[in-house]
Amino acid sequence: MKKEEERIIVIGDIHGESTWMDIVEKHPGCKYIFLGDYCDPYNHDLSDEEVIANLCSIIEFKKQKMDDVVLLLGNHDIQYVYNEAERCSRRMAHVEEQIVNLFKTDISLFEWGRKVENIIFTHAGISQGWFRFASDKADKHDIIKFITDPQNKEVAFACGYARGGNAIHSGFFWADKRELTEPLEGYIQAVGHSRVPEILFRKITEDTVIFFCDCLSMGKYLIIEKGGDSIQFYSALLGEDKSTLLYTFHL
């Protein structure tokens, strides 16, 4: 295993779960990227108070480690922040005002996407079809600038048929796994949104790969390590010391 500072821990959709704390405790001193969807729990045993307290803890964790923690917004989050966003199941609509205030107070701590080396992190993923749709405005070689520009809300927030919307191609907050059979060419992606039983990945070419990471509820997460002339991607499970190598990308 490489030095801790060369390791990125990718944490899938939260939905009120505090499992992320155990992952951080297991992997101290790393970089941490949260893929979004902090509220609206699927676990009905979680109270509103627990979910909100968990979001507050995540925000505080970011404030304590500004350079080491990335908080991405998901489709369940943007609906509380932007009027233009498509609405999805608001399991916490009765405390909406409190959630809106939390996000808006610290919105500067949240991002739409992040790029590290040739790896792009977004909530749901970028399809080649969506890129072609948006290509009159986007340069693939400067894609991160485009996807983090709030002026591009219309295409970014697009919700396709697979998730109940009307857009031909979903944007990177809504893209379903079924829409990502052709992910953005020339990049490796790590995304959440589409629930999977474990870390799954789809390889198109050596440099066009997408990892699906929405399996935090199963205690599973992605580890990315850079060492020498390669980047390695591991699947990890809480409660187990050994991680499983999934893919090696040679720089």
Where are these regions (language model features)?
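MPN/JAMM (Mov34/JAB) isopeptidase/deubiquitinase module and associated MPN-bearing subunits/adaptors
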Residues: 231-251
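Active-site neighborhood of phospho(di)ester-bond hydrolases with catalytic His/Asp-centered motifs
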Residues: 10-12, 32-36, 70-75, 121-122, ...
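Core catalytic region of metal-dependent phosphoesterases/phosphodiesterases
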Residues: 11, 16-102
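Conserved beta-sheet core of the metallophosphoesterase superfamily
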Residues: 175-236
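Structured catalytic-domain cores with a bias toward divalent-metal coordination
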Residues: 11-14, 109-115
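Beta-strand-turn-beta hairpins that frame and shape the catalytic cleft
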Residues: 1-9, 114-121, 208
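Active-site-proximal loop/helix segment associated with metal-binding centers of metalloenzymes
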Residues: 94-97, 111, 115-185
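Active-site environment of divalent metal-dependent phosphoester hydrolases
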Residues: 15-20, 40-42, 76-82, 127-129, ...
